[in-house]
């Protein structure tokens, strides 16, 4: 019996050592493809003695991993849903939320598309599949090719809520794994349209359309219709290196990195809003 106790102690020690040397972060592609890796690199350069294991596979995976104990931090481009919170609670996980930055969902079209502005109603109708040809919104005749995120993405559902009044995407929409894939498809297809986070605008062959005259930018975060906060989540109040990294992300240095990557720093968003 005593030997079993010692084995358990050793296993616990090994688990604690891993938590101190490797920080596992799972979830949102919007946050995990650019922002969080750059925050992680800056944290290490400033003396953070930790390695990072970051997987950006969609916001929903933040909560499945936290529930399973396979992540110390979850990244999400939306608030946790009720069923995700219930899953975590059932596993004994108490979610703590940290607002890390503001994002803006930008509508991308091909740079050769003459359409430069859309109304909110037109955006809804395009992504719901009601408007099927660019000539219906003043563009060159041609069938609209629609690109969205996949169902594990927080942006997938967030866009339905913010831009589509709860309606589903058109049947011909093509689901992409990440922002960069959407930008690539739109950039190579003159009839393409999709959405990306603010940090992914300016991709080759694409341009951003204004929404009722408003271009997504730090200055328009209050007025742009598809602005949203983004979050990090932990299981309970963070401790140790997890706490150190969270604090780094939320301090002025972290806020500066947020802005450089292309997101809206939370301090700037708070002042404007």
Name every feature range the model reports, one short phrase each.
Residues 15-17:
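N-terminal export/targeting leaders of redox proteins
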Residues 4-13:
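Sec-dependent N-terminal signal peptides
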Residues 19-273:
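Exported/periplasmic ABC-transporter solute-binding proteins
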């Amino acid at each position: 019996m005593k030997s079993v106790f010692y084995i358990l102690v050793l296993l616990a020690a090994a688990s604690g050592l891993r938590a101190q040397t490797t920080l596992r972060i799972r979830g949102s592609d919007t946050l995990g493809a650019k922002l969080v890796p750059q925050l992680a690199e800056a944290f290490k350069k400033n003396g953070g003695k930790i390695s990072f294991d970051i997987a950006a596979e969609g916001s929903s995976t933040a909560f499945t991993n936290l529930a399973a104990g396979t992540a110390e931090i979850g990244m999400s481009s939306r608030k946790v849903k009720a069923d995700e919170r219930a899953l975590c609670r059932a596993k004994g996980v108490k979610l703590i939320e940290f607002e890390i930055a503001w994002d803006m969902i930008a509508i991308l079209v091909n740079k050769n598309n003459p359409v430069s502005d859309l109304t909110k109603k037109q955006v809804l109708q395009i992504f719901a599949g009601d408007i099927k040809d660019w000539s219906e919104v003043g563009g060159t005749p041609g069938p609209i090719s629609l690109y969205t995120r996949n169902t594990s993405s927080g942006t997938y559902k967030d866009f339905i809520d913010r831009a589509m009044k709860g309606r589903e995407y058109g049947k011909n929409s093509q689901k992409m794994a990440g922002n960069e894939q959407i930008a690539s498809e739109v950039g190579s297809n003159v009839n393409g349209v999709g959405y990306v986070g603010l940090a992914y605008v300016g991709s080759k062959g694409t341009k951003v359309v204004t929404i009722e005259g408003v271009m997504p930018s730090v200055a328009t975060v209050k007025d742009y219709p598809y602005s949203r906060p983004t979050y990090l989540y932990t299981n309970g109040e963070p401790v140790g290196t997890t706490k150190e990294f969270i604090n780094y992300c939320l301090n002025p240095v972290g806020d500066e990195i947020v802005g450089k990557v292309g997101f809206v720093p939370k301090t700037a968003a708070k002042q404007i809003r």
